[in-house]
Amino acid sequence: MQLHKNLWVVAMTALAYVGLLSFNQFIFSAFNASAASGLVFLPGGLGLVCVLLFVEWGSLGMALGALLMGMGSVYTDDPITTIGAAVLSGLAPWLTRALCVRCAEFDEDLNGLTASCLLRMTVAFAAVSALLHQLWSVARGQGGDLWGGLALHFTGQLLGALVVLYSVKLLLDHLPRLSRG
């Protein structure tokens, strides 16, 4: 039964990624430098939320969603580059979470996850994601301007994550309080 729930998390995370990336492209297409790296990249925030909540299953869902969009030529027509970028889309938030837990920012069960801790984690996530994706692009011969791409990717991940995190917070603040009895 647990495997069934975990597969459900993977599928829903992947579908949410596809939907949010499509929405992101529609809304921000006039401002983006490329389809995969924009000034505001909302799926990065989704990855952070899903990996915080569902750990490796959220990471797997992010990678699957990125792969689905990549195979639709969002990233490139090169399947190896697409697969690598998809893996990194799931790996970056998972790696950031693991680093923050290891550095005692918060516990595995999210005890101690404060607003300032979440902000530091968001900045760390944007840096890790930007660095991993830019290194992958350079390794695949598609890096172009390394520092410009790194700055753009970092900014897009950071702003996208902040938009998603604050949207989730706003939603949670306005949900009716559930009774505990």
Predicted regions located by residue number:
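Short helix-perturbing small/polar motifs within transmembrane alpha-helices
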Residues: 2-32, 47-53, 57, 61-141, ...
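Hydrophobic transmembrane alpha-helical segments of multi-pass transport and channel proteins
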Residues: 154-163
